[in-house]
C-alpha cells in the first residue's frame, strides 16, 4: 500500500484518537497528544461527513472536557488547527479554546 505523507498523517491521527477513546472509556485522563488527536479526528471526520467549517470550529470545542484531561493540559491548548478535506476542497479549521 503506497500512502502519501498526508494520508499517513491522517492514519496516525485516527489511530491516536482510537487509543484516546479507549483510555477515556477506562477512566484514564488524556495527555496533550491524545486530546489533540481526539479533536483533530472529530474535525477530519466531520468534514468528510459534509459539516461546515463554522460548525466544526464550534463543535470541536466540546469534544474534550477539562475533567477528562491530565492536569495542565487544558491550559496548554489555546487552539487546534487541522487541515480537513471538505466536499469543496481542503480547508484549515481552527478550534479556539478546544478544552473547556
Curated annotation (Swiss-Prot):
- Keywords of the record: Cytoplasm, Hydrolase
Any idea where this protein resides?
Cytoplasm
Q: What is its EC number?
A: 3.5.1.5
Q: Which Gene Ontology cellular component terms are annotated?
A: cytoplasm
Mention one GO biological process in which this protein takes part, according to its record: urea catabolic process
One matching Pfam family, short form? Urease_gamma
Q: Identify a single GO molecular function assigned to this protein.
A: urease activity
Coiled coil regions, renumbered to chain = none
Principal location: cytoplasm
Q: In which pathway does it act?
A: Nitrogen metabolism; urea degradation; CO(2) and NH(3) from urea (urease route): step 1/1
Q: Which reaction does it catalyse?
A: urea + 2 H2O + H(+) = hydrogencarbonate + 2 NH4(+)
Q: Which family does it belong to?
A: Belongs to the urease gamma subunit family.
Q: How does it assemble?
A: Heterotrimer of UreA (gamma), UreB (beta) and UreC (alpha) subunits. Three heterotrimers associate to form the active enzyme.
What protein am I looking at? Urease subunit gamma
This protein's species is Cereibacter sphaeroides (strain ATCC 17023 / DSM 158 / JCM 6121 / CCUG 31486 / LMG 2827 / NBRC 12203 / NCIMB 8253 / ATH 2.4.1.) (Rhodobacter sphaeroides)
Q: Which gene encodes it?
A: ureA
